[in-house]
Amino acid sequence: MNTIPRYAVFGNPVAHSKSPQIHRQFALQEGVEIEYERICADIGGFAQAVEAFFANGGRGANVTVPFKQEAFALSDEHSERALAAGAVNTLILLENGKIRGDNTDGLGLTDDIAKRLGVEISDKTVLLLGAGGAVRGVIPVLKEYHPARIVIANRTHAKAAEMAVHFDIDAVPLDELEGGFDIIINGTSGGLSGQLPAVSPKIFEHCTLAYDMVYGEAAEPFLAFARQSGAKQTADGLGMLVGQAAASYRLWRGFAPDVLPVVQYMREL
């Protein structure tokens, strides 16, 4: 019988996921052997795929696009973060056989900004671009840092307005945004196709940090635009990716990985 602990990331598509390499580095830090695989679940077949994984020795799983809401629905119990976000990116098999859903996206983002990059969030004005699942998942943890104001802006304003009411933050139409933001976070997926959010360069004039939740080349169009428009510092989402993975690993195994060397390792791949 295979006694090596099994973990996985579920998504569709998922072949591009860097999670296996990241978790392998965490296991090396802990000094253990784990299995970590990518599982491409069929649209409409996510719940069955998760059930089969846990029935065959799975201990925990990460969940990425487009299954985070479905992961929330199938979880038997939820962390406060997951309840606040309405989405789950981490599934934990409990000793009683039930599945607990958590959301570590917000921890990954705020740890990266506040700890690794050393940028203050409390009493600052934060702009979130986009109103999808990625943004929804980070708002509850951002609020714990007590920023002076959180503003959300999205191509479809109604979606941003709905999220603003839900989280008690502000929504402003993209074309009405002006300056005055300390931290600007791009949570749109436009960078994957080279598109920029339809915003004025003026929004970056007093910006301490422009941050893109995606990483690598996909983040570069937005970050280059931010730099040219006056942002003092820019960062892609690699630290967030490693940070949310580290939080998941800690929930599964009770071991807190050191994020910094893994960010460096992934950057050099």
From Swiss-Prot:
Record-listed shikimate binding positions: 17-19, 64, 89, 105, 215
CC annotations in GO: cytosol
Reactions performed catalytically: shikimate + NADP(+) = 3-dehydroshikimate + NADPH + H(+)
Pathway: Metabolic intermediate biosynthesis; chorismate biosynthesis; chorismate from D-erythrose 4-phosphate and phosphoenolpyruvate: step 4/7
Pfam name, any one: Shikimate_DH
Matches recorded under Gene3D superfamilies: Leucine Dehydrogenase, chain A, domain 1 (3.40.50.10860), NAD(P)-binding Rossmann-like Domain (3.40.50.720)
Active-site annotation: 68
Protein name, per record: Shikimate dehydrogenase (NADP(+))
Organism: Neisseria pharyngis
